[in-house]
Regions:
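Non-catalytic regulatory/accessory regions that flank a structured catalytic core
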Residues: 3-11
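Short, Gly/Pro- and small/polar-rich lid/capping loops
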Residues: 16-19
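Short linear motifs in intrinsically disordered
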Residues: 22-25, 60-61
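Conserved beta-strand hairpin/beta-sheet module of binuclear metal-dependent hydrolase folds
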Residues: 31-99
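Surface-exposed, flexible loop/turn segments at secondary-structure boundaries
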Residues: 49, 118, 141
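Active-site metal-binding motif and surrounding structural segment of the metallo-beta-lactamase
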Residues: 87-136
Length: 142
């Protein structure tokens, strides 16, 4: 799935606790930025300046990204996280997600297209933090 994102400078999701365009960095150089898509919809883009396979395979510029989309929970409904990153981004992704969601006891739906060993580590961490997590996978055997 390809998503074209445009940042809206005056947009602030009503219930997300976020700083517009906030960035979290680590010693490894990975960071996560927040890009609002629409009311209640936020892209969490994990960035890495290091050389990765995408640069070689797809002739992209140096570095790679891991894009996730978070849909705000409506009253009485679960928040929806689509395509969380792999374990390499967990140290920058999980703190931002925790800040945005606030209450770890709220239901959380996680949607993935496939599950691989890299993603399983982050999914395990999510399940430990959010006991009401429900995983939806369209191709769990891939």
């Amino acid at each position: 799935m390809t998503v074209v994102l445009q940042a809206f400078p005056d947009f602030m999701p009503p219930r997300f606790k976020t700083d517009q365009g906030s960035v979290v960095s680590t010693a490894a150089g990975r960071r996560t930025i927040q890009l609002p898509i629409d009311t209640g919809v936020l892209c969490l883009r994990g960035l890495s300046p290091e050389r990765h396979r995408f640069e070689l395979e797809y002739a992209l510029e140096r570095g790679s990204t891991a894009n996730s989309v978070l849909f705000e929970a409506a009253d009485g409904a679960a928040a929806v996280l689509v395509h969380p990153p792999g374990a390499a981004y967990s140290s920058v992704f999980l703190p931002q997600l925790n800040t945005l969601l606030g209450d770890a006891e709220q239901p959380l739906l996680v949607v993935v297209g496939h599950v691989n060993p890299n993603r399983i580590a982050l999914l395990r961490s999510l399940a430990e933090i959010y006991p009401k997590l429900e995983l939806i996978a369209s191709n769990p055997g891939a």
